[in-house]
From Swiss-Prot:
This is Phosphoinositide-interacting protein. It comes from Mus musculus. InterPro entries: PIRT (IPR028068). The keyword Oxidoreductase does not apply. The keyword Coiled coil does not apply. Residues 1-21 are annotated as: Disordered. It holds the Pfam family PIRT.
Length: 135
């Protein structure tokens, strides 16, 4: 028959087991979860909510204007220059890239607004459920 090993002493534990933290309470699990905590009541500012689409739209608009400038310069200069051919290829590329980023930012804003409304409804129903169940 096999002999079962004795329980390991504290000093004999592997280094990986020393790194693990002991489980504490259910509330600590809620706090460490990836989702936003229901317990936080501080509302986010508009900048915190919309900063990513604003940055994408700003960069897209800058690239779009750069593409417009390059394209205009390419068609104003005479075709004798070798640089003109390169500018005529790069200009429309910047135009399309800038327009794409600008449109992505513009589409992102209504998506965030819809998500915020759903989150508000969800928080309302969670608080209502909490109120009704704890009577």
């Amino acid at each position: 028959m096999e002999v079962l090993p004795k329980a390991l002493e504290v000093d004999e534990r592997s280094p990986e087991s020393k790194d693990l933290l002991p489980s504490q309470t259910a509330s600590s699990l809620c706090i460490s979860s990836r989702s936003e905590s229901v317990w936080t009541t501080t509302p986010k500012s508009n900048w915190e909510i919309y900063h990513k689409p604003i940055i994408i739209m700003s960069v897209g608009a800058a690239i779009l204007l750069f593409g417009v400038a390059i394209t205009c310069v390419a068609y104003i200069l005479e075709e004798k220059h070798k640089v003109v051919q390169v500018l005529r290829m790069i200009g429309p590329a910047f135009l399309s890239l800038g327009l794409m980023m600008l449109v992505c930012g513009l589409v992102w804003v209504p998506i965030i607004k819809k998500k915020q409304k759903q989150r508000q409804k969800s928080n309302f129903f969670q608080s209502l459920k909490f109120f009704l169940l704890n009577r």
